[in-house]
UniProtKB/Swiss-Prot annotation:
Gene Ontology MF annotations: transcription coregulator activity
Subunit structure: Component of the Mediator complex, which is composed of at least 21 subunits that form three structurally distinct submodules. The Mediator head module contains MED6, MED8, MED11, SRB4/MED17, SRB5/MED18, ROX3/MED19, SRB2/MED20 and SRB6/MED22, the middle module contains MED1, MED4, NUT1/MED5, MED7, CSE2/MED9, NUT2/MED10, SRB7/MED21 and SOH1/MED31, and the tail module contains MED2, PGD1/MED3, RGR1/MED14, GAL11/MED15 and SIN4/MED16. The head and the middle modules interact directly with RNA polymerase II, whereas the elongated tail module interacts with gene-specific regulatory proteins.
UniProt-recorded name of the protein: Mediator of RNA polymerase II transcription subunit 22
Family listed: Belongs to the Mediator complex subunit 22 family.
GO cellular component: core mediator complex; mediator complex; nucleus
Subcellular location: Nucleus
Function: Component of the Mediator complex, a coactivator involved in the regulated transcription of nearly all RNA polymerase II-dependent genes. Mediator functions as a bridge to convey information from gene-specific regulatory proteins to the basal RNA polymerase II transcription machinery. The Mediator complex, having a compact conformation in its free form, is recruited to promoters by direct interactions with regulatory proteins and serves for the assembly of a functional preinitiation complex with RNA polymerase II and the general transcription factors.
Transmembrane segments: none
InterPro entries named among the record's database cross-references: Med22 (IPR009332), Med22_Saccharomyce (IPR016530)
Modification type N-acetylserine: residues: S2
Note: Present with 2181 molecules/cell in log phase SD medium.
Domain of life: Eukaryota
This protein's UniProt keywords: Acetylation, Activator, Nucleus, Transcription, Transcription regulation
Amino acid sequence: MSNQALYEKLEQTRTILSVKLAELINMTTIADRNDDDEGSFAQENSELAVATTSVMMVNNQTMQLIKNVQDLLILTRSIKEKWLLNQIPVTEHSKVTRFDEKQIEELLDNCIETFVAEKTT
């Protein structure tokens, strides 16, 4: 990913987190009840249903917040890794061979001769 794409994704995730957190705060505010009624059974069931739905919505928003925070952590890690890797100087590999090819060829020939000699006897 390019730097620009990482920063755009970071900004997008930050915006989503802000919106989801605001929605979560709005859902958790408790409205004033109208206590003028005597509290009939139907009203209690209705309040229970609303409360249950609200709890489910809060849980859903919380899970989305957690996922977005995880995305944010992954993005910041990618940005840090990219920054660190760009700081490391690139070393050129030497073209000098580590092994003597002639010596390796002789060892291979000796092994083949030994193997063939064992098969024939």
